[in-house]
Structure formats: C-alpha cells, structure tokens
C-alpha cells in the first residue's frame, strides 16, 4: 500500500516526496533488507533474511539431510536509529504562493533525510568490520575500468557470490570512470548511451553500479565499495506517533517497501503549518566477506 493518509491534499504532498526519498536511497538495494509500513517502536527487532554462498554438493550416502544448506540465516536488526526533518510555512504563504510551496519544501527535506540515513548506514563500512580494501588506495583520477576488474578479482578471492553484486562509488570516482575509454566506447548500449547522455552506468564487470555523494568523510577514507546483499542487513519500519496530529501516516514505496512517516500539525499562535517526516531504521554487519572497500590515499 502506498500510504496510510486520508486527507487528499496531504496524500498529494506526501506522494510528491516519495520519488526523491526512494531514488536517494537506491544504493541501499546493495544490501539485505526488510522494509515495511508496519508500525513498530524504537528498539524493536526486525528479522532480516541473509543469503550467502551455498555449501558444496556432496555424494549421496543414504540420506538427503546430511548436506542441508545452512547459508540462509536471519539477522536480528534493532530499530535503534530515528531521524527526522521538519518544515513549516505560514498559512498566508501557503495560500498566496503560486507553486505548492509545501510540496517543494517537503521534497527537499525528504531528500536530505534519505541522504542522512544512507550516510549513517555507510558508517558501518569500516576496516574493523570488513578488513583490507579490495585494491590499493587510489585517487579519483586513477580510477578506471582496470580498477573495477581489480575489485572484481578481490571479490572472487573473498568467495563473494557472483550474482547480485553491486559497486557503489563516490561521485568523483564515478565521473572518472565515465571518461574511461573502455566504458565510454563500449558497444554495449546500456553502458555507452546512458553514460554519455545521462551520466549513468547501469552494469559494469558484473556489478550493478551506483553513484553516491554521501559517503562519510572520516578516518576510514572510504570512497566506495563492492557488496553482495549478505554484507549488511538493514530494516525499516513506520514509527506510529503517540500524540494526536491533524494528519499522520506511513508513506511507502510499493516496490521496495522504503517507508517514511508523515505528520502534519498547525501552531495556532503563529498561524504556521508544520510537516515532519521521519525514518525509523536499523542496520548491522551480516557476513564480512560480502563487502570489499575502496579507499583513497
């Protein structure tokens, strides 16, 4: 279900913000997820299925239960993260502005909320959690197709499953990759045409490729990573408000389940309309061999 709001105007405003929220969080598809508009409280636990590399086959020896695959596990993820953004306009501003000022403000707020959530999740990608980088540290100007092949080789050495791999890289590294001769002159239309026209690389060397500009700037010197969904488990739910609001509900992407909460209320003394958007979520490392980091010098 797309949302749980009832007011037509609120539905229109909230739905306009769903696309920037979902598109900003697109790189989160690289991980194992359990997203839903189901209500939950902070510190509740959500079970996220994790599928790693399958166990080898064995010769039949009289029983089919001796080689039961145990690589499908469930990671308990605590919903211990809660971020929000609040916008407001005066009743006069809302009535006299030619464009829908609430929609414009909310789209910007929700995009920032999504960026902050994504940055927070990326803080889990550390040397302590995932070990040495895939390839030696390099600057953005040195990142090219051969670098991607080096990352691919590191994933193979780590026995990362070949399917469902993703490569998430900082915008500067992504831009340099767009200018690589092999990428730019590729005869594979989904790579070359989208790269030139839209600045998009959908698939490369077996990876789904995502550009991001929200990688945390800290001592880890992280600029990207290659990941299988088994690396990190992420959960997201709707935090149902306790107080009374003029309108409140969950806004959900029906395809991915990505959800943010929406609350509208009015401050009568100042004659201002407030809208708060929030995200209740949690994450944890699942299988360390499911991710290989990229770092800068």
Model-derived regions: residue spans:
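Extended oligomerization regions of viral-like shell subunits
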Residues: 42-47, 155-256
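N-terminal "assembly arms/tails" that initiate or stabilize quaternary assembly
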Residues: 1-79, 295
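Short helix/loop capping segments that flank catalytic or ligand/cofactor-binding pockets
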Residues: 56-59, 97, 176-179, 186, ...
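Short acidic, glycine/tyrosine-flanked loop/strand segments centered on an H-E-D-like triad
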Residues: 73-96
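Extended, compositionally biased alpha-helical segments that mediate assembly or anchoring
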Residues: 259-297
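Hydrophobic alpha-helical segments involved in membrane association or supramolecular assembly
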Residues: 48, 167, 273-277
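Alpha-helical scaffold segments that mediate packing/assembly in large oligomeric complexes
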Residues: 93-162, 171-176, 293-297
């Amino acid at each position: 279900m797309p949302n749980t709001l009832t007011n037509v105007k609120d539905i229109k405003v909230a739905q306009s913000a769903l696309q920037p929220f979902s598109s900003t969080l697109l790189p989160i598809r690289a991980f194992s997820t359990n997203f839903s508009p189901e209500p939950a409280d902070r510190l509740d636990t959500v079970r996220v299925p994790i599928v790693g590399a399958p166990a080898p086959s064995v010769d039949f020896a009289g029983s089919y239960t001796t080689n039961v695959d145990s690589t499908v596990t469930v990671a308990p993820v605590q919903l211990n993260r809660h971020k929000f953004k609040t916008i407001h306009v005066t009743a006069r501003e809302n009535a006299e502005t030619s464009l829908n000022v609430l929609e414009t403000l909310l789209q910007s707020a929700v995009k920032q909320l999504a960026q902050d959530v994504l940055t927070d999740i990326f803080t889990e990608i550390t040397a302590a959690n995932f070990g040495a980088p895939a390839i030696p540290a390099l600057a953005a100007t040195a990142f090219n197709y051969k670098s991607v092949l080096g990352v691919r080789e590191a994933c193979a050495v780590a026995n990362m499953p070949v399917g469902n791999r993703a490569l998430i890289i900082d915008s500067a590294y992504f831009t340099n990759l767009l200018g690589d001769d092999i990428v730019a002159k590729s005869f594979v239309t989904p790579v070359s045409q989208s790269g030139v026209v839209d600045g998009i690389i959908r698939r490369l060397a077996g990876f789904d490729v995502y550009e991001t500009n929200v990688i945390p700037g800290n001592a880890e010197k992280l600029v990207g990573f290659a990941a299988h969904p088994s690396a990190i488990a992420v959960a997201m739910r709707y935090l149902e408000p306790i107080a009374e609001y003029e309108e409140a509900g969950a806004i959900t992407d029906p395809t991915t389940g990505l959800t943010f909460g929406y609350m509208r209320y009015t401050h009568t003394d100042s004659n201002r309309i407030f809208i708060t958007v929030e995200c209740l979520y949690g994450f944890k490392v699942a299988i360390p061999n499911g991710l290989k980091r990229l770092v800068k010098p």
